[in-house]
């Protein structure tokens, strides 16, 4: 899938990320989901099982940095910043946010 963001901004004092893609899809993705589903190796379990990240309901996005033409890095209020969020990943998170959050809450 080739999707490109036309607009990307943190909103609601950093509690959400709004992304508008070139196919006109607009998503508001909560910071909690972005943090607990971070694509970083330590969260995704590249060196062991996937970690369940707890107590991130009040997490906020501090800063967004563009990585080339394909992704962003998000710096969160807990200092986590090692995940690289590709455009495709953000689109997937936006499209499947409710399901991903339900799965996360069920795992707690």
Label for each model-derived stretch:
Residues 1-108:
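Motif-centric detector for short Cys/His coordination patterns
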